[in-house]
């Protein structure tokens, strides 16, 4: 579905035909904090990982919001890197949030992954720092398969994406537990010498 394979019942369209897009807007810098005050804030791709961004900053004065499961896309160099918001969050001017108009978020995510090569052109168009405008993002040309094919794809991909998100949450929980317990174990505050292992 995401390669040139002669798929039938595909129509030409634009990203705005299947997605709601919000361009980020940075809140006042004085509202940024690392003390978990306010709303999670993602400034740009610096917080990105393979799929889900790392939480580093919060803001008490959010301006533009992305909802949980929205696609976060870098709109400044390098243009086109994507992650998925795992919480409602504020997005800065280095990002855009992209949400399916028809509840086909997995299809939209893999469509955006497939557009990476197309988006790379915005990193080399004669400017020192690559960027993509709102109009250019809205009008990215895409192939839109039939509703039936999209639903079939969604039935396969969506449970896998949910599993990835759940695994990520479990990893975060275990990392937090490790970071809490390890210093106490190292200092002797918690004594495990008398624990019997079977």
Language model regions located:
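Non-catalytic DNA-recognition/assembly elements of restriction-modification systems
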Residues: 1-26, 143, 147-192
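Sequence-specific dsDNA recognition surfaces
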Residues: 13-32, 37-68, 91-92
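Generic alpha-helical structural context detector
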Residues: 16, 20, 40, 96, ...
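A short, aromatic/hydrophobic, helix- or strand-capping loop or linear motif
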Residues: 29-31, 123, 168-169
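A short beta-sheet element
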Residues: 43-45, 60-117, 121-137
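Active-site proximal loops enriched in glycine and acidic residues that flank catalytic Cys/His/Asp
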Residues: 75-76, 86, 99-102, 144, ...
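Short, charged, low-complexity amphipathic alpha-helix
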Residues: 126-130, 136-155, 194-198
């Amino acid at each position: 579905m995401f390669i040139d394979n002669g798929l039938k019942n595909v129509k030409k369209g634009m990203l705005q035909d299947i997605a709601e897009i919000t361009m980020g807007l940075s809140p006042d810098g004085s509202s940024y904090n690392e003390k978990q005050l306010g709303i999670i804030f993602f400034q740009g791709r610096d917080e990105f990982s393979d799929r889900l961004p790392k939480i580093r900053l919060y803001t008490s004065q959010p301006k533009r919001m992305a909802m949980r499961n929205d696609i976060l896309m870098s709109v400044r160099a390098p243009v086109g890197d994507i992650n998925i918001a795992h919480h409602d969050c504020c997005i800065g001017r280095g990002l855009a949030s992209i949400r399916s108009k028809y509840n086909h978020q997995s299809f939209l995510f893999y469509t955006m992954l497939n557009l990476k090569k197309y988006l790379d052109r915005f990193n080399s168009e004669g400017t020192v720092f690559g960027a993509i405008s709102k109009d250019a993002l809205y009008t990215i040309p895409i192939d839109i398969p039939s509703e039936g094919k999209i639903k079939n794809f969604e039935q396969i991909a969506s449970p896998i994406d949910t599993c990835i998100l759940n695994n990520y949450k479990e990893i975060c929980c275990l990392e937090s537990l490790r970071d809490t317990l390890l210093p106490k174990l190292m200092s002797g505050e918690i004594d495990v010498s008398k624990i019997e292992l079977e």
